Amino acid sequence: MSVVNNRVALTNLVSMEALTTEEVLGLINRGSEYKAGKVVISDHQKDLVANLFFENSTRTHKSFEVAEKKLGLTVLDFNADASAVNKGESLYDTVLTMSALGTDICVIRHPEDDYYKELVESPTITASIVNGGDGSGQHPSQCLLDLLTIYEEFGRFEGLKIAIAGDLTHSRVAKSNMQILKRLGAELYFYGPEEWYSEAFNAYGTYIAIDQIIKELDVLMLLRVQHERHDGHQSFSKEGYHQAFGLTQERYQQLKDSAIIMHPAPVNRDVEIADSLVEAPKARIVSQMANGVFVRMAIIEAILNGRNKNS
């Protein structure tokens, strides 16, 4: 991976640690340029992209689709429920098929952690892989749109106090963000139920009670409680969680005037955040959704740059 003519060029995008700091900042900057309407878009109709989503998704799936169509790519329709997956076809063979049909890029979301490893290591699959979320692993495009949202607000990452809060163990968003935010110089804090916390997070920040740090925060990044990834044996009270760990009206009032609230969505209202705060003045949840299109345009462009460079 490299930066060519001041433009990022990628073969695949599967994790944040695979990106250099220069590439991360380049993608954020390019997303900002797309948002500002500063980019003359080339004709990409000959380039084929398939969005292979094996988990439910609204924001990631549709914003990739919007990004691809804005760039002029030909988007191949794929419905997992109506595909040979229901006949037992593996993910590998599905992607192998798409690649053989001439698909240039496969954007994939899959419930298996690290699903992409055998795909990017395959000598036969020529399609580039963009990870749209792997199990409880990583979510690089969400991370990049989060970075753009933060940078738009503060113009920097160095020294910002950022708390990532909630269902940490199951969150691919947390795992992608904590790595790059620490690398960019942010001061990270984590909070949530102890049973949803892993010591692996200690290398990136400090586990702390929300009420000890909330007045100092620049960014409060809330995470969805992922009921579908729990084993079903844990007792859970929405009201209990909201009062102990959620953003209540009382906690909102303690945030600095300059602080912002983020959430990757979908939001469990009155669980992670009070219903009335989802569109509050400090909330940037809608901005995150909008920024997703522009960052994903930058990602797709970077993949096409990489393919053209290697062709």
Swiss-Prot record:
GO cellular component, one term: cytosol
Keywords noted in UniProt: Pyrimidine biosynthesis, Transferase
Sequence positions that bind carbamoyl phosphate: 59-60, 109, 139, 142, 265-266
Sample GO molecular function, one term: aspartate carbamoyltransferase activity
Coiled coil: none
Xref: InterPro entries: Asp/Orn_carbamoyltranf_P-bd (IPR006132), Asp/Orn_carbamoylTrfase (IPR006130), Asp/Orn_carbamoylTrfase_sf (IPR036901), Asp_carbamoyltransf (IPR002082), Asp_carbamoyltransf_Asp/Orn-bd (IPR006131)
Pathway(s) served: Pyrimidine metabolism; UMP biosynthesis via de novo pathway; (S)-dihydroorotate from bicarbonate: step 2/3
Entry EC no(s): 2.1.3.2
Positions contributing to L-aspartate binding: 87, 172, 224
GO annotation, biological process: 'de novo' pyrimidine nucleobase biosynthetic process; 'de novo' UMP biosynthetic process; amino acid metabolic process
Role played: Catalyzes the condensation of carbamoyl phosphate and aspartate to form carbamoyl aspartate and inorganic phosphate, the committed step in the de novo pyrimidine nucleotide biosynthesis pathway.
Family of this protein: Belongs to the aspartate/ornithine carbamoyltransferase superfamily. ATCase family.
NCBIfam families noted in UniProt: asp_carb_tr (TIGR00670), PRK00856.1 (NF002032)
PANTHER family: ASPARTATE CARBAMOYLTRANSFERASE, ORNITHINE CARBAMOYLTRANSFERASE, MITOCHONDRIAL
Complex and partners: Heterododecamer (2C3:3R2) of six catalytic PyrB chains organized as two trimers (C3), and six regulatory PyrI chains organized as three dimers (R2).
Protein name in UniProt: Aspartate carbamoyltransferase catalytic subunit
